[in-house]
Regions:
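Conserved beta-strand hairpin/beta-sheet module of binuclear metal-dependent hydrolase folds
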Residues: 2-58, 147-151, 155-160
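Metallo-beta-lactamase
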Residues: 5, 95-224, 234-236
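Active-site neighborhood of phospho(di)ester-bond hydrolases with catalytic His/Asp-centered motifs
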Residues: 42-44, 65-74, 93-97, 157-161, ...
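Active-site environment of divalent metal-dependent phosphoester hydrolases
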Residues: 49, 74-79, 100-103, 124, ...
Length: 252
């Protein structure tokens, strides 16, 4: 399913959901950002998603004109299809420098040579046509080397595994966070590493004019749901905050 998140002038942001959906696999969203005659694919997914995503991208934009493949982190549902994207395009893959030497394990020998750009911990600006995407530090939310991608032109924060919702229709855009939290809380309490990290993130992103927060699983957030989510995340105990001796015992 194709969802148009933004379309103004030369700049478009498209979300693909339920590409190659399987009942025994987690639902994922993939993204295409186009600016003029070039574009970037964000979190292209695993092999389950590849065929449907490649065809979906091809209907919107010539894949050989992609200038970047962006990966928020190195989980298989993010980038396990990389071998096929390395064949189908000449674009480099941008990923945390922590994962730079892990990425070749997704591909046949030699396919990634000279095509992996390690994003430093502080982030970087990535040109896409006449625009840019900014890799924002999102480490330990949940991966050790993790980035979100801020598109100032559309006002969209592509948030990776933060703001995820489970068991929902991903094509629904949420503006009222309250009823939606039941689909978010368990995931965030387990997958996010600590409240300290969430507070640091909240302080960073509050300074941005965010129109939408769009995660890699589940529904996009817009309008009042954006500041409400930032406030909620800032106050959430999660990850190591919830762990104690009872969680580290020999099984019975």
């Amino acid at each position: 399913m194709l969802i148009e998140l933004f379309n103004k002038g030369p700049h478009r942001c498209l979300m693909f959901c339920d590409m190659g959906a399987a009942q025994d696999a987690v639902q994922t969203n993939q993204f295409l950002i186009v600016n003029g005659e070039t574009g970037a694919v964000l979190d292209p997914g695993g092999n389950l998603a590849y065929n449907d995503l490649y065809m979906g991208v091809s209907r919107q934009f010539p894949p050989h004109k992609l200038s970047a493949i962006l990966a928020s982190h190195a989980d298989p549902d993010i980038i396990a299809s990389l071998d096929r994207w390395m064949t189908a395009t000449t674009a480099p893959v941008y990923i945390s420098a922590i994962w730079e030497r892990f990425v070749p394990h997704f591909c046949k020998p030699g396919k990634t040579a000279g095509r992996v750009v390690g994003i430093p911990d502080a982030g970087m600006r990535i040109p896409v046509g006449g625009s840019e995407l900014i890799a924002l530090p999102a480490h330990f939310m949940h991966a050790e080397g993790n980035f979100q991608f801020w598109d100032a032109e559309s006002g969209i924060l592509f948030s990776g595994d933060l703001a995820v919702s489970v068991g929902v229709d991903p094509s629904r855009i949420v503006s009222d966070l309250g009823p939606h939290l039941r689909h978010m809380e368990a995931f965030h309490r387990r997958y996010m590493v600590s409240n300290k990290i969430l507070r640091l993130w909240a302080d960073m992103v509050r300074r941005l004019p965010i129109r939408m927060i769009v995660p890699q699983h589940g529904c996009p957030l817009e309008g009042p749901a954006v500041p409400a989510f930032i406030d909620w995340a800032e106050g959430l105990d999660c990850g190591v905050d919830l762990m104690g001796p009872q969680n580290y015992r020999m099984p019975a």
